[in-house]
Amino acid sequence: MSDSLRIIFAGTPDFAARHLDALLTSGHNVVGVFTQPDRPAGRGKKLMPSPVKVLAEEKGLPVFQPVSLRPQENQQLVADLHADVMVVVAYGLILPKAVLDMPRLGCINVHGSLLPRWRGAAPIQRSLWAGDAETGVTIMQMDVGLDTGDMLYKLACPITAEDTSGSLYNKLAELGPQGLITTLKQLADGTAAPEAQNEALVTHAEKLSKEEARIDWSLSAAQLERCIRAFNPWPMSWLEIDGQPVKVWQASVIEDATQSLPGTILAATKQGIQVATGKGILNLLSLQPAGKKAMSAQDLLNSRREWFIPGNRLA
């Protein structure tokens, strides 16, 4: 293509690999790929390459895996590639200002939210957690702040009542490459129109933790149902019964008022396990005891009915 750009790609997980794959079929020239060092994974803790590294090596691209880009010799790896632009997607390393300034057109990032909403580490999960009606991707010019750069392009998608973080991740992994290719075309032909973020609209997407995913029955049923979808597939909402963690895969909200204390089991039938919350009733539909597969409430009641006796309270 006549407006082909020399591109350095920096990314690590599958989400990033999907963007690299789109670049490789776009007519641009990917001159080098930066990704995180191989990490131990699986039961055997064998060193495993990132999805981005696997794809890059399949395509015969030069791969670089520095632990940090702060050392001068690692920054020189970037400089020696003489790139027009560096594309960063879920890379996992901080880019020092010296690196941000190296490419002719700077560095651009694909972020999984409609900035300035949900800057930070967990934008997909927080959009579900908060009950947002839509989310999307933002392609932005990177600066030294955390997701603070000027916005170059946005694509939105609705959030449905059935979406989990896993399903939303897949939707944004389709949108992101579309937005990236459009943005690169605009950068190449000089039509990109950077837009500053409105600081008054900023929200921060804090990292998730397993402790946050423990079900707090004092919250409303609506909030808990959103948490269950937001924390799926990680870290998974959970409750503790007889000292065992039980993951919750699916639940629904029953708006009926109840005078029972939060955590009180109201009913346990094949239609679900109904539990009082701070507001409304949460109907547990699919659960996973430790060491078992996920199962319907009915199947769990067949083997563990003593866990869910109406009138008892869950911790």
Swiss-Prot record:
Annotated GO MF terms: methionyl-tRNA formyltransferase activity
Amino acids binding (6S)-5,6,7,8-tetrahydrofolate: 113-116
Any one Gene Ontology cellular component term annotated for this protein: cytosol
InterPro entries noted in UniProt: Fmt, Formyl_trans_C, Formyl_trans_C_sf, Formyl_transf_N, Formyl_transf_N_sf, Formyl_transferase-like_C_sf, GART_AS, Met-tRNA-FMT_C
Keywords noted in UniProt: Protein biosynthesis, Transferase
PROSITE patterns: GART (PS00373)
UniProt-listed Pfam families: Formyl_trans_C (PF02911), Formyl_trans_N (PF00551)
Origin superkingdom: Bacteria
Annotated catalysed reactions: L-methionyl-tRNA(fMet) + (6R)-10-formyltetrahydrofolate = N-formyl-L-methionyl-tRNA(fMet) + (6S)-5,6,7,8-tetrahydrofolate + H(+)
NCBIfam families on file: fmt
PANTHER family, sorted: METHIONYL-TRNA FORMYLTRANSFERASE, METHIONYL-TRNA FORMYLTRANSFERASE, MITOCHONDRIAL
Annotated family: Belongs to the Fmt family.
HAMAP family, per database record: Formyl_trans
Identification of the protein by name: Methionyl-tRNA formyltransferase
Organism in which the protein naturally occurs: Salmonella dublin (strain CT_02021853)
Lineage, highest ranks first: Bacteria, Pseudomonadati, Pseudomonadota, Gammaproteobacteria, Enterobacterales
